[in-house]
């Protein structure tokens, strides 16, 4: 069936119309303002990723790929020798922007490998083509995740999700929200509960915004109410995205995901993870090996003077709590190998 249209006026991440810049929808300003930004300088691209102007593992990968290309083109003046000299440094600076999301490193690695195998005189064109391939693949992977995920989203489903893994987190219709968009397009009635997702409120600001724009019934709840909601039998399934999936099936996702998974298990509600193959990292053995990014204390609001903060951006949900993994290749089971990982 036709793919449902994006609930956004423009994709969250992609090329500018003239193909000379990285275009993003600045998510720091949502839902109050919709501001599109065109970026070409490496530092502003790194800053956009680091400050969550563009966020979501797949979207970060696309942003890094396009951003690396346009920054190299601008700063080299189109001179390949200069671009090759800048490549390693620019790639490393982008990879350091957010360490937990595997798609960022995956996309940069693809471009670096492309540069190394490309003949002299055609590197910049080859990098541009590879970045576009990464963007187009993400759109297709989102659609495939949505199609496969329809199997667990029946008519009348009541779904809980955490953070934002929708169109705002990808170049397409999302990962965790893709099956919901597909189900809605088929006329299935849905009730969605979106965790607020403190401290940056991605669920309240972003998930609720894009679902409501698509005409899907959505309610926001404080993070601390998720267990109560599950205990009252008001949820049929939980679907979340992922920033990195270890070889054994452990999943790093927005902090608070682990608590939702524990509550879902306690109340016998199936818990699914939706992610493209590019988010599976067979080189990371378990969740204990995943580097967890910590954010600044000022994200937590005003604190008493001298009181420190512990503010991890992600937590790790063990494989034992996960009913299934919905990927662009269908439902998969760990242990994961290179064959499960797109582009490795």
UniProtKB/Swiss-Prot annotation:
Top-level taxon: Bacteria
- Pathway participation: Amino-acid biosynthesis; L-methionine biosynthesis via salvage pathway; L-methionine from S-methyl-5-thio-alpha-D-ribose 1-phosphate: step 1/6
Q: Which residues form the active site?
A: 243 (proton donor)
Any matching Pfam family: IF-2B
Q: What class of enzyme is it?
A: isomerase
Query: Which positions does UniProt annotate for substrate binding?
Result: 55-57, 98, 202, 253-254
Record site: Transition state stabilizer: 163
UniProt-listed Enzyme Commission number(s): 5.3.1.23
List GO molecular-function terms, semicolon-separated.
Answer: S-methyl-5-thioribose-1-phosphate isomerase activity
One Gene Ontology BP term is:
L-methionine salvage from methylthioadenosine
| Keywords per UniProt | Amino-acid biosynthesis, Isomerase, Methionine biosynthesis
Swiss-Prot/TrEMBL catalytic activity: 5-(methylsulfanyl)-alpha-D-ribose 1-phosphate = 5-(methylsulfanyl)-D-ribulose 1-phosphate
InterPro entries for this protein = IF-2B-related, IF-M1Pi, IF_2B-like_C, Initiation_fac_2B_a/b/d, M1Pi_N, NagB/RpiA_transferase-like
Q: Name the PANTHER family for this protein.
A: METHYLTHIORIBOSE-1-PHOSPHATE ISOMERASE
Report the family membership: Belongs to the eIF-2B alpha/beta/delta subunits family. MtnA subfamily.
Query: What is this protein for, i.e. what is its function?
Result: Catalyzes the interconversion of methylthioribose-1-phosphate (MTR-1-P) into methylthioribulose-1-phosphate (MTRu-1-P).
Under what name is this protein listed?
A: Methylthioribose-1-phosphate isomerase
Species per Swiss-Prot/TrEMBL record: Gemmatimonas aurantiaca (strain DSM 14586 / JCM 11422 / NBRC 100505 / T-27)
């Amino acid at each position: 069936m036709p793919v449902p249209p994006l609930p956004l006026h423009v994709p969250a991440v992609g090329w500018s119309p003239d193909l000379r810049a990285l275009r993003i929808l600045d998510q720091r300003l949502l839902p109050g303002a919709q501001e599109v930004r065109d970026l070409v300088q490496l530092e502003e691209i790194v800053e956009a990723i680091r400050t969550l102007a563009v966020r979501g593992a797949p979207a970060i990968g696309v942003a890094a790929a396009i951003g690396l290309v346009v920054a190299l083109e601008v700063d080299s003046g189109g001179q390949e020798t200069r671009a090759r000299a800048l490549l390693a440094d620019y790639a490393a600076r982008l990879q350091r922007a957010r360490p937990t999301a595997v798609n960022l490193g995956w996309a940069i690695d693809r471009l670096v490998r492309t540069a190394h195998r490309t003949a002299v005189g055609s590197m910049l064109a080859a990098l541009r083509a590879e970045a576009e391939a990464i963007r187009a693949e993400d759109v297709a992977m989102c659609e495939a995740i949505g199609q496969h995920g329809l199997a667990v989203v029946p008519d009348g489903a009541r779904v809980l999700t955490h953070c934002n893994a929708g169109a705002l987190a990808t170049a397409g219709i999302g990962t965790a929200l893709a099956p919901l968009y597909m189900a809605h397009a088929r006329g299935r009635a849905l009730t969605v509960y979106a965790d607020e997702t403190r401290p940056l409120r991605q669920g309240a600001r972003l998930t609720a915004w894009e679902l409501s724009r698509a005409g899907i019934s959505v309610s926001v709840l404080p993070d601390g109410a998720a267990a109560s909601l599950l205990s009252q039998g008001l949820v049929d399934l939980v679907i979340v995205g992922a920033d990195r999936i270890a070889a054994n099936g452990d999943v790093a996702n927005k902090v608070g995901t682990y608590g939702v998974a524990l509550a879902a298990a306690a109340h016998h509600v199936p818990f699914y993870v939706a992610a493209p193959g590019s988010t599976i990292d067979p080189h990371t053995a378990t969740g204990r090996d995943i580097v967890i990014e910590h954010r600044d204390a000022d994200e937590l609001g005003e604190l008493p003077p001298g009181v420190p903060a512990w503010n991890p951006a992600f937590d790790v949900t063990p494989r034992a709590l996960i009913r299934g993994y919905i990927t662009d290749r269908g439902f998969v089971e760990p242990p994961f190998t290179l064959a499960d990982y797109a582009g490795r």
